Amino acid sequence: MSYIVRFTGLLLLNAFIVRGRPVGGIQH
């Protein structure tokens, strides 16, 4: 279940970063 938590955390963090910053410089 560790990988699930890590995957969810990564998705949340990625979504938060994309929402906080305009998509253009970092498109991962």
Curated annotation (Swiss-Prot):
One Pfam family in the UniProt entry: Leu_leader
GO BP terms, alphabetized: L-leucine biosynthetic process
UniProt keyword terms in alphabetical order: Amino-acid biosynthesis, Branched-chain amino acid biosynthesis, Leader peptide, Leucine biosynthesis
Source taxon at top rank: Bacteria
NCBIfam families assigned to the protein according to its UniProt record, in alphabetical order: PRK14744.1
UniProt function note: Involved in control of the biosynthesis of leucine.
Protein name as catalogued: leu operon leader peptide
Organism annotation: Salmonella typhi
